[in-house]
Design a protein with these regions (language model features):
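Long, basic/Gly/Ser/Thr-rich N-terminal segments
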Residues: 2-145
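Generic hydrophobic, aliphatic-rich segments that mediate packing or membrane embedding
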Residues: 123, 127, 154, 164-165
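Phosphate-binding P-loop
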Residues: 146-153
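Well-ordered, non-transmembrane segments within structured domains
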Residues: 155-158, 165, 244-250
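Glycine-rich phosphate-binding P-loop
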Residues: 157-179
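Short beta-strand-centered segment that lines the nucleotide-binding/catalytic pocket of NTP-utilizing
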Residues: 180-188
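PAPS-dependent sulfation machinery
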Residues: 188-250
Length: 250
């Protein structure tokens, strides 16, 4: 037994070293080229290039057919996980169809999305975080029902097809300096129930910034198309994520 434990420890150490090396490399074909003047031309966005450590994770999970066991995507598991993380058990008011929306979304993910293991992991974590925030928003409204009576004065609504400049227009409006133009930060759209200042705000901002860093690791040039930081302005569409029936899930 001691010999086995020592061998397992050695193997684990070697795997850790290998993964550390692989994490510095990227697998797959080049997805972009850079010209001499620094301009970036994206060439293979349909077949993106990922860190080798991600490719290795996908291969490992797929080879051993462990995806359903390691990364469950069922409503009971997700709700229980979100409840355990928050200590809350109420996710919506009576008559709110959020649960049927969640069920339909999960069925669609399993039947249509054809996710890799890392894609399934990210979807699972996003769903859990979404449910956590849904529970926190529900609690906040129960404690402060006056929130629902705050009038929305002349909201500015931007609509358009993807890649037509809607984000740029939104960001431009946030820079206007006009006192009547309010906006949310990326951190606020992901964690709307968090306090606007103090330790809770700092924790929320840190968590969101860590998520931004992870996205940068996964997709190093994403910021060239869409700059994202925890405290930068962001479209409010992520507020709809908690309905499980909004644009970010499509």
């Amino acid at each position: 037994m001691p010999a086995c434990i020592s061998l397992c420890a050695i193997i684990s150490a070697l795997v850790a070293i290998l993964l550390a090396i692989m994490s510095q490399r990227r697998c797959g074909g080049s997805e972009y080229t850079t010209t001499q003047d620094g301009r970036i031309s994206f060439t293979q966005l349909s077949h993106p290039e990922y860190p080798c450590i991600i490719a290795g994770f996908n291969t490992l999970i797929t080879s051993f057919n462990m995806i359903d066991w390691l990364l469950p995507l069922n409503e009971e598991y997700l709700i229980a996980k979100a409840s355990a993380n928050t200590g809350l058990a109420i996710f919506g008011r009576e008559g709110d169809p959020w649960r049927s929306h969640l069920r339909q979304l999960l069925n669609a993910i399993k039947a249509e999305a054809d996710l890799s293991p890392i894609g399934r992991f990210m979807s699972q974590q996003q769903l859990i975080k979404s449910l956590e925030q849904r529970a926190r928003v529900t609690q906040l409204i129960d404690e402060r029902p006056d929130i629902l009576r705050v009038p929305l004065l002349r909201p500015l609504i931007i609509t358009g097809m993807p890649r037509t400049g809607t984000t740029l227009l939104h960001n431009l409006l946030t820079l206007s300096g006009h006192p009547g133009v309010q906006h949310l930060t990326y951190a606020a759209t992901l964690q709307p129930a968090a306090a606007a200042s103090g330790p809770e705000h700092k924790l929320a901002r840190t968590e969101v910034q860590q998520a931004v860093i992870f996205m940068g690791f996964m997709r190093p040039l994403f910021s060239a198309m869409h700059e994202m930081e925890a405290e930068l302005p962001h479209e409010e569409l992520h507020l709809q994520v908690r309905s499980a029936a909004a644009n970010p899930w499509t």
